[in-house]
Amino acid sequence: MDATFTAEQEEIRRTLRELLLKRCGPEEVRTAVQSEGGYDSALWETLAQQLGLPGLAFPEAYGGVGCSVTELALASEELGRSLAPSPLLATAVLSVPLLLAIGSEDQRAALLPRIASGELTAALAVPGASLTIALGLTGDNRGDWAGGGRAGGVQARRTDDGWRLYGQADQVLDGHSAGLLFVAAHTGGFARSRTLLFLLRSGSPGVTRVRLTSLDETRSQARVQLRDVEAELLGEEGESSDVAGVLASVGDSAAAVLAAEAVGAADRVLERTVEYVKQREQFGRAIGSFQAVKHRLADLYVQVQAARSAAYYAAWATAAGEERVGGLALAQALEALRITSSEAVQLHGGIGFTWEHEAHLYFKRAAGDELLFGPVHRLREHAADAARLFGGGEVAV
């Protein structure tokens, strides 16, 4: 593994950081999350058309940039620093890999160029509130998470002219605004029946989307209800796809990207805290000069840097097709962000507890992502089970 960034990777980081410093400060973030889409559409257009972010990690033949998960992780690290609300996670990290892995050539040719241009955003809808299980991050994703029929969840029924979907999906990231939904559904009325993926276009009759109130407002979520909805199968009819295996692979790469994003957030909130303790005075001196405060900040720095190393390695391993360590990296990064943001609130004193200050936004990102993709101990437990560290049986990953 070469840990040195290429000139192209450094340019991605530098350009994004400069842009976000100008256009995505705390006030811009608050304004964006209150908008109908939950993000700044003008900023998203710039990220797509000038920087090529949505298509960063897919082939140039479909309008992408042709980079890898590593570059996507570096870009997400910069977005995490500013907590920039955007459809990048739902579209480029969770949805595009499914289209590349399972979609037919016609589907890829029709949809990927529109995604690359920023014209089309996408979201992954899995039944109930089981995103972390569906992605294989905290357990075996070949179980009954998708429900189906009397088991609940989302059911797909074959008809003479195609497929029909029934059911409900929660925790759908950017599901209220996405122009394209990737829906996981069971094809039978029992818990372990076959799972397939389907495409739903914007405006499909029978689809109800409700934006949910979430702990982390920068990570928009929606509930998607399906009532006799006509759907298009992802991939070719008659082909057998290992949907659970593909979802687990996507989950690992998504975890690596999310880990980098969390590291970016932790790094930024630590920077802001260091700046503040150099200015705030008690007993006639800056509180940052007290040894107890220095030690707390030093511990945070070590934790953030360790998480960064884990995130970078996970991104590299994913891009190189090596071992799956995204879940472990995500656990370390989420823990680092939670501890760092919590300490930031404390070290800022009274102002750190106010709504106007940005510290609570970082704490909510940590807590919200643990609810969506964790918790940390479950991520580590599953990684240990998969590696059979404690003599357990074989676990599918």
Locate each region found by the language model.
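N-terminal glycine-rich flavin-associated loop
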Residues: S86-D106
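A short, Trp-centered hydrophobic/proline-enriched beta-strand micro-motif
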Residues: G118-L137
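Alpha-helical interface subdomain recognition
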Residues: M1-G80, I102-E105, R114, G118, ...
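Short secondary-structure capping/junction motifs at helix and strand boundaries
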Residues: S86, E105-L112, T121-A123
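A structural signal for short hydrophobic beta-strand segments in well-ordered beta-sheet cores
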Residues: V154-A156
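A short core secondary-structure module
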Residues: A125, Q168-V207
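Flexible, small-/acidic-enriched active-site or ligand-binding loops
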Residues: G136-R142, Q171-V172, R201-E236
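A generic structural signal for well-ordered coil/turn residues at beta-strand boundaries
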Residues: L120, R150-G152, S177-G179, S193-R194, ...
